Amino acid sequence: MIETVALAVVAMVAVFFVALGAASLVVPARASRFLLGFADSPYKHYAELATRFLVGGAFLLTAPRASWPGAFSVFGWVLVATTAGLLLVPWRWHHRFARWAVPEALRLLPLVGASSLVLGGLVLWALFRGPDGGPGA
């Protein structure tokens, strides 16, 4: 049961990456507003951390069933570890960093969009291809 939920979470994250990539390329102003909204309140900060932790755990649980278990494990552990680090940082510091970093990233929005599309597609492919080249689910 938990593996099925983890698989669904990772699939939803992949679809999110595809949607973010498409929005970044087709409606960049809307994508920019969305990205600028992160970490601007304590609630959003902790919601982001909870989401990152959940997604990291889902990648770790899904890794054995994916085409690239090593990549899924590394990505999952990176999310879990950086989330733990962000838990130690006051949300105002995270907010200050986001106010600086997001506008810098938005200068490269077409690249962010294309990368997001590719990442989402690769995650979906790795999920549904599975570790032995067959369906992963």
Tell what function each PLM region has:
Residues 123-137:
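Juxtamembrane boundary at the C-terminal end of a transmembrane helix
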Residues 66-88:
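Short alpha-helical packing/oligomerization segments
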Residues 22-40:
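Membrane-interface helix-loop junction between the first two transmembrane segments
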Residues 84-98:
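Transmembrane alpha-helical segments of integral membrane proteins
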Residues 1-17:
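Hydrophobic transmembrane alpha-helical segments in integral membrane proteins
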Residues 48-59, 112-120:
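Core segments of transmembrane alpha-helices
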Residues 23, 29-30, 54-66, 89-93, ...:
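Membrane-helix exit/interface motif
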Residues 9-12, 39-52:
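A loop-to-helix transmembrane entry motif
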